[in-house]
Amino acid sequence: MINLQEQISLFKIIGSQLKNKVECIAIGGSAMMFYGAKNATKDVDMVFSKKEDLEDVKNILYKSGFDERNNIKGIFREDETAGKPTMMDGKDTRFDLFLNEVIGFQIHKDTIERIKEVHDFGNFTVKTASPEDILMMKACTERERDRDDAAELVRKFNIDWNAVINESSKQTKIGIAAFPVLLYDFLTELRENFNVDIPKNITKELLLIAEKRLEELKKQDKLIKVTKYK
């Protein structure tokens, strides 16, 4: 685990060693610490838009004592092609470096437009994803601590639920087709098990979006039948 000041120190090291300007988006606990919504985090999660930028940061972490984890245990809901991170293990924390998507959640211009803060560390610019985007990304994982983080996000911030609904609809076309169902299950769990105030009209709307997308895929004959054998 590292706290905000320790994270800032690591970002300063990266910025001082980069030869060119590199930008990324902080998500998860890393972004939540910048927002003051979390005191410490186990993972520093970052999304890059360029492969070469990710590799530059990865190489600096390697030279700073981090090792790449080759055997990534699945935290993926949909399939093994969902945006896997490059994981760099350190003594007190782990960097998860994503490229353009987070476990199937696609990063695009609307995600960037919703960014709330920008932190400059020399050649390293770290932008913080919006609380709405952090919440939606956490719906794509199966880690229990992500439920705790998501509950804190909803309690601390005035979530723009219209943005969540609009993004959920968009993700069905550019990311995971079943994303509204994942988010519905996730938010329902937060409401029932974490006593979080999730508007019922929002979860209802998510199901309607999912049903609409399912009908579209049926008409286009793009549904895939999956049979599981035990």
For each feature predicted by the language model, list its residue ranges:
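Compositionally biased terminal segments of proteins
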Residues: 1-230
